[in-house]
Swiss-Prot record:
Binds 1 Mg(2+) ion per subunit. Mg(2+) binds at residues 111, 226. The keyword Metal-binding applies. It holds the Pfam family NTP_transferase. The keyword Protease does not apply. One of its GO terms (molecular function) is magnesium ion binding. The lineage of its organism: Bacteria, Pseudomonadati, Pseudomonadota, Gammaproteobacteria, Enterobacterales. The gene is rmlA. It comes from Salmonella typhimurium (strain LT2 / SGSC1412 / ATCC 700720). This is Glucose-1-phosphate thymidylyltransferase. InterPro entries: G1P_thy_trans_s, NTP_transferase_dom, Nucleotide-diphossugar_trans.
């Protein structure tokens, strides 16, 4: 089976969140008890992906390196690349060409939070897909804000539109994408859209026209949270807090995921918990490995 590498796109200027993001990356803001980037990172980890490239702005990349390091503490290999200007999501594959090499890849947006009991199982088919692409569709109330996918009666994708004024369905394409290696050349040959960006929707449309696009449904029981506004930041934090306080279990905790997937051992978790031992996060890690 081919290796699949992951990319987290954590760039952008975050202007919709000004003044909050005037001096700090949006993806470093807290979502309840963790930095935002822990959530997309955890999504890739749950898919079994351990080689991950983080793409961010020139000013924010050193901050991500300070927070995450080389990933070895979680049994990962993290690398970093700079996106000088936000020229579209598909630019990630051009920036990451050397990192991707001859492997398949997955892209997750740094401000997207995914939650659901069967999320690893849902991603498994995409991870194991030998060729083509897989995107994930989610029913939303305001599809005009997103890339929208339209289905025929058999559930096959027949159209993709980016932020349409008159959406043909209520199904948005989420910020999680799995591609085979041909995505790199597609991105390099892509023409900028009317707004001057290399659109991920255009990549997905090429796969669709080739008959190589799979659409997996994130149905009821899944949460897909977009954290692009002040209100959605609060809502995401409240959502995570409600689940964690009710269950006594963490959502998107990289240390726990790494431990449960055997990326790291119990002793390594205990060492990671040391500097955090005075707060609930560190206590949770210690309790988890001791099985109390």
């Amino acid at each position: 089976m081919k290796t699949r590498k992951g990319i987290i796109l954590a760039g952008g200027s975050g202007t919709r969140l000004y003044p909050v993001t005037m001096a700090v990356s949006k993806q470093l803001l807290p979502i309840y008890d963790k930095p935002m980037i822990y959530y997309p990172l955890s999504t890739l980890m749950l898919a079994g992906i351990r080689d991950i490239l983080i793409i961010s702005t020139p000013q924010d990349t050193p901050r991500f390196q300070q927070l995450l390091g080389d990933g070895s503490q979680w049994g990962l290999n993290l690398q970093y690349k700079v996106q000088p200007s936000p020229d579209g999501l598909a630019q990630a594959f051009i920036i990451g060409e050397e990192f991707i090499g001859h492997d398949d890849c997955a892209l997750v947006l740094g401000d997207n939070i995914f939650y659901g009991h069967d999320l690893p199982k849902l991603m498994e088919a995409a991870v194991n897909k030998e060729s083509g692409a897989t995107v994930f569709a989610y029913h939303v109330n305001d599809p005009e804000r997103y890339g929208v996918v339209e289905f025929d009666q058999k559930g096959t994708a027949v159209s993709l539109e980016e932020k349409p004024l008159q959406p043909k369905s209520n199904y948005a394409v989420t910020g999680l994408y799995f591609y085979d290696n041909s995505v790199v050349e597609m991105a390099k040959n892509l023409k900028p859209s009317a707004r001057g960006e290399l659109e991920i929707t255009d990549i997905n449309r090429i796969y669709m026209e080739q008959g190589r696009l799979s659409v997996a449904m994130m149905g009821r029981g899944y949460a897909w949270l977009d954290t692009g506004t002040h209100q959605s930041l609060i809502e995401a934090s409240n959502f995570i807090a409600t689940i964690e306080e009710r269950q006594g279990l963490k959502v998107s905790c990289p240390e726990e995921i790494a431990f449960r997937k055997n990326f790291i051992n119990a002793q390594q978790v205990i060492e990671l918990a040391g500097p955090l031992s005075k707060n609930d996060y560190g206590k949770y890690l210690l309790k988890m490995v001791k099985g109390l």
